[in-house]
């Protein structure tokens, strides 16, 4: 079982149908899907509704506290939970990830695509 971290803003929000299909497939294969967002805890209700509207199933929703720094918050969640793969649009957050976390950068203004979904699926299927 792998533990997958997915950011919301700039990641899920940019292509919700892809992340809906990915999350459903991961959960069906007994992986865990952790939504790790810098949104504040006060926005939990709104965020849960938005994820439901996007049809994004997940195992746990991790939200920041006001005093948290974005990169450090996401890195601490990844370390605590044991995240294997992280999808995020923030290069700063990805660079802060603990050693060993596979990273998929989901956005760059100068890049028109990132890792193809088949490459991602092959990586997640490895070592089952």
Where are the language model's segments positioned?
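Hydrophobic/aromatic side chains embedded in well-ordered alpha-helices
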Residues: 1-3, 82-83
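Alpha-helical substrate-recognition element adjacent to the catalytic core
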Residues: 2-69
């Amino acid at each position: 079982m792998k533990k997958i971290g997915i950011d919301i803003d700039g990641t899920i929000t940019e292509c919700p149908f892809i992340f809906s299909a990915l999350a459903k497939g991961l959960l069906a294969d007994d992986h865990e899907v952790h939504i790790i967002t810098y949104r504040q805890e006060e926005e939990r209700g709104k965020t849960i509704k938005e994820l439901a509207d996007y049809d994004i199933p997940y195992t746990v929703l991790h939200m920041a506290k006001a005093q948290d720094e974005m990169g450090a918050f996401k890195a601490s969640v990844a370390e605590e939970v044991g995240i294997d793969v992280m999808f995020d649009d923030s290069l700063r957050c990805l660079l802060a990830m603990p050693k060993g976390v596979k990273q998929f950068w989901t956005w760059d203004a100068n890049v028109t695509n990132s890792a193809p979904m088949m490459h991602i699926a092959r990586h997640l299927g490895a070592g089952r």
